[in-house]
């Protein structure tokens, strides 16, 4: 197993504390994963919503960065890390105070880059956002 697979198994199993930023932002962990894909459900806390009960777009971007990183971890090389070099979120519908199904997937992996995308769906299956990122592969210590 690679460091990414080990870490994803720990997060899925609840066997490790989540990083402070994840705890502070209430991003949560991970429900399931396999090579090239990840999945989680997430319920927004009331204090994370706009005054009209909608999801704050910047918060959706933080969730996107997390799920896209999880997806990249499924194919990350054993001898390297990665860093987000580009993140784009397309907002399709207004998100509300309801459970979201979030799925990330690897679109392509080259020697130096991992391309990932994610969908955010409300309980009725309607797409509310789609996110895209490029993860630059960097050697450990680099």
Which residues fall in each region the model found?
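Terminal targeting signals and extreme-terminal segments of soluble enzymes
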Residues: 1-142
